[in-house]
Design a protein with these regions (language model features):
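Amphipathic alpha-helical interface segments within eukaryotic helical scaffold
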Residues: 108-109, 114
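Charged helix-capping and loop-helix junction motifs
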Residues: 137-143, 171-175
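Conserved catalytic network of the ASCE P-loop NTPase/AAA+ motor domain
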Residues: 73-76, 88-93, 114-119, 146-151, ...
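Conserved G1/Walker A P-loop phosphate-binding module
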Residues: 2-71
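Conserved Switch II/interswitch segment of TRAFAC-class P-loop GTPases
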Residues: 103-106, 119-140, 149-150, 162-167
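Canonical P-loop GTPase G-domain recognition
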Residues: 165-221
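Switch I (G2) and immediately adjacent beta-strands of P-loop GTPase domains
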Residues: 65-108
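Conserved beta-strand/loop subsegment of P-loop NTPase cores
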Residues: 122-125, 148-162, 181-194
């Protein structure tokens, strides 16, 4: 019997998330659709996260995605692939479709960013580890909090570009944004997710942990 190693690897990845493309014995009762926004200052790595997710969830893509760019080649708005996977909850199987959108980090497009957040179920805040960009991180984070504070939208914080020579210490970053000094919240999610999106480091874990928060938020309403 010939074994397709690449296909098996994809199946193992799906199983780790509780994902399955098989119907099994459970009855598919409901389709859940969520929207996840990647938010942060300009050039912090939001679009890079998007491309890494496309690679890591290649077997679950529903569409190829598309983007809108400014005349200088910067991303204005990008609608990622929709990801489809299953969640087994007792005798019910949910088909979960997640739309991923990246918001521009350019400050002159603030109104566009607020529009992108409309209908969001979760947010990944992507900060830049460059020590010279702490103020940009703080401004972008304040904007995010102001838009989400009354909407009960869960978010996780990703500190990208940890491979920079002058990367800001994580404790200094936490202090600048007014975050807790401990590493994990009571639900197990991290206060800050150190990442190197170019290499794909921790990009998937950050996304998966946010999706758990989104699902918990949905089922607790």
């Amino acid at each position: 019997m010939t074994v397709d190693t690449k296909e098996n690897e994809k199946e193992k990845e799906k199983e780790q998330l509780g994902i399955s493309g098989k119907t099994g014995t459970n009855v598919l009762r409901e389709v859940l659709q969520f929207k996840v926004v990647y938010w942060g200052p300009g050039e912090s790595g939001k679009t890079t996260n998007y491309f890494r997710l496309r690679e890591k969830f290649d077997g679950l893509k529903l569409n190829r995605g598309y983007s809108i760019q400014t005349t200088d080649g910067r991303t204005l708005w990008q609608d990622s692939i929709r990801l489809s996977f299953y969640l087994n909850l007792e005798a019910i199987k949910f088909n979960i479709i997640t739309q991923i959108v990246t918001a521009t980090g350019q400050e002159r497009f603030l109104s566009t960013r607020e529009y992108v957040l409309d209908g969001a179920d979760g947010v990944v805040f992507v900060a830049d580890s460059d020590s010279d960009k702490l103020e940009q991180n703080k401004r972008s984070f304040r904007e995010l909090v102001s838009f989400t504070s009354e909407k009960n939208i869960p978010f996780v914080i990703q500190l990208n570009k940890r491979d920079l020579e002058k990367a800001i210490p994580i404790d200094e970053f936490k202090n600048g944004l007014g975050l807790p000094r401990f590493e994990n919240y009571g639900d197990g999610t991290q206060v800050v997710y150190p990442t190197v999106a170019l290499e794909g480091d921790s990009v998937r874990k950050c996304f998966e942990d946010l999706m758990m928060l989104v699902l918990l938020n949905f089922f607790s309403e």
